[in-house]
């Protein structure tokens, strides 16, 4: 999907009542109420996020090699960066949504969400192909 899909949804939902920061390695079309930062998340200076954040949404995934162990390892590396952002900036009571792969990376993320949030949910959007290992895990109400 094109960069900015989640940002469009959140912008429409907030309708000007909040601020949105989007970070993507690819260019993204201008979206109302969205501050866009073009960066590879692995190289991003998290100090630029110098404000409390209510919700972190991540739709990031590594390039797929087709080798499950490598793909899971690469996904976990990205999830660790996302969790670092959650730990540094997400407010108490905040929420976190992240893409992962069913299996190794989802088990890792499940454990990490359970440590940090009161509620954890597994989501598979209707738009996701049935054979796809891609799922989302949602952490609600950060401790």
Language model features with spans:
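Glycine-centered, small-residue-biased loops immediately flanking beta-strands
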Residues: 18, 94
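Mobile active-site "lid"/loop adjacent to the S-adenosyl-L-methionine
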Residues: 39, 51-93, 104
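Class I S-adenosyl-L-methionine
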Residues: 100-143
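Conserved SAM-binding loop of SAM-dependent methyltransferases across substrates and taxa
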Residues: 2-15
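S-adenosyl-L-methionine
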Residues: 19, 23-65
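Conserved helix-to-beta-strand junction in the class I
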Residues: 13-14, 85-92, 99, 116
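Short, ordered loop/turn segments at secondary-structure junctions
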Residues: 1, 25-26, 41, 61, ...
């Amino acid at each position: 999907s094109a960069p900015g899909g989640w940002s469009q949804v959140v912008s429409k939902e907030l309708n000007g009542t909040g601020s949105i920061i989007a970070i993507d390695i690819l260019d993204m079309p201008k979206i109302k109420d969205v501050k866009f930062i073009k960066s590879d998340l692995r190289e991003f200076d998290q100090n630029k996020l110098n404000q409390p954040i209510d919700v972190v949404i991540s739709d990031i995934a590594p390039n797929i090699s087709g080798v499950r162990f490598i793909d899971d390892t690469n996904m976990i590396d990205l999830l660790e960066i996302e969790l670092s952002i959650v730990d540094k900036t997400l407010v108490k009571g905040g929420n976190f949504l992240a893409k992962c792969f069913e299996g190794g990376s989802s088990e890792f993320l499940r454990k990490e969400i359970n440590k940090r949030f009161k509620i954890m949910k597994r989501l598979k959007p209707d738009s996701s192909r049935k054979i796809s290992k891609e799922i989302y895990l949602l952490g609600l109400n950060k401790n």
